Amino acid sequence: MSENDDRDPGHGASDGKAASPLIRVLGCARAELVPGEVVSVALPRGASRRPREALVLLGSDGAPRCYLNECRHLPIPIDLGSKRYLTNDKRHLLCGTHGALYRLNDGVCVTGPCLSLALTTLPLIEEEGVLYVDVSALDP
């Protein structure tokens, strides 16, 4: 386990059934989030061994959101490593390969080949002004 992830073996085990452990990765300080900017967070590699990252940003309502950086049309990062995640007007996440536009508030594609599909949402946990990305549901 890296210094950036925490495991809580009792996570969700209130009914006596075994539950998956909480695995969280340090995201960023809440104060680092600025409207119109995206913070990328490296995630543990999954079964495919490909690098993965989360995109942490503020929705139009000012609440933090987090999505897996993976287009819904093809399983590739929306920025292809360029670190350019947003449209010029900063109103949508942009897949640089397909031109898909995703809403900031819910990650739903509004234009492009994956119309109406949503980016994978990753839960955020906030503790004392620090945001952690819950990666428990991702493939190990």
Regions found by a protein language model. Give the residues of each.
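N-terminal pre-ligand scaffold of iron-sulfur
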Residues: M1-N88, R103-L104, A118-P140
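Short cysteine clusters
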Residues: C71, C95-H98
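Short cysteine/histidine-rich metal-coordination sites, predominantly Zn2+-binding motifs
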Residues: Y85-L94, C109-L117
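Short beta-strand His + acidic residue motifs that chelate non-heme Fe in jelly-roll/DSBH
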Residues: Y102-R103, T111
